[in-house]
A protein has these predicted regions:
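Catalytic cores of nucleophile-dependent amide-cleaving enzymes
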Residues: 1-59, 65
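An often Trp-containing, charged/polar helix-loop segment at the C-terminal end
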Residues: 53-128
Length: 128
């Protein structure tokens, strides 16, 4: 597939302060996917789960046919930063997480994603 979205990808970054990997799990995954022909890859470095992750990736994939991957991602993050947050729909958010507000503007929800794109689709559109 030309576009791959892996919102549940597990990496060592998920363990936070525990001693983790050196990033090879991400690098080798990206190399394998790109060598198989993928042009756009979105993967998570830690799992957030929940409704916000679903909405974020849904918005990204809906916008991807209409704009470059970076613009589609920026738009989806902006929408989620202003979207209402329902803690009951977020399995990794507990009652003790008081610094989270009423919206999903905390970086926990969107900063853990890594977008890799060849830019080929955007270049082809500009040449026409």
């Amino acid at each position: 597939p030309q576009q791959v979205v892996l919102p549940g990808f597990h990496t060592a970054a998920e363990n936070g302060l525990k001693k983790g990997g050196n990033g090879n799990e991400i690098f080798l995954t990206l190399c394998g996917l790109m060598s198989s022909g993928s042009q756009t890859i979105l993967l998570s470095r830690w799992r957030t789960g929940g409704q916000t992750a679903y909405d974020l990736t849904r918005e990204f994939t809906q916008e991807l046919p209409h704009r470059p991957a970076s613009a589609a991602w920026q738009r989806s993050v902006q929408l989620m930063m202003h979207a209402p947050l329902d803690p009951e729909q977020e399995p990794r958010v507990g009652d003790q997480d008081t610094e989270l507000g009423a919206t999903a503007d905390h970086p926990f929800f969107w900063a853990g994603y890594l977008l890799v794109d060849t830019g080929d689709a955007a270049d082809a559109g500009e040449e026409k």
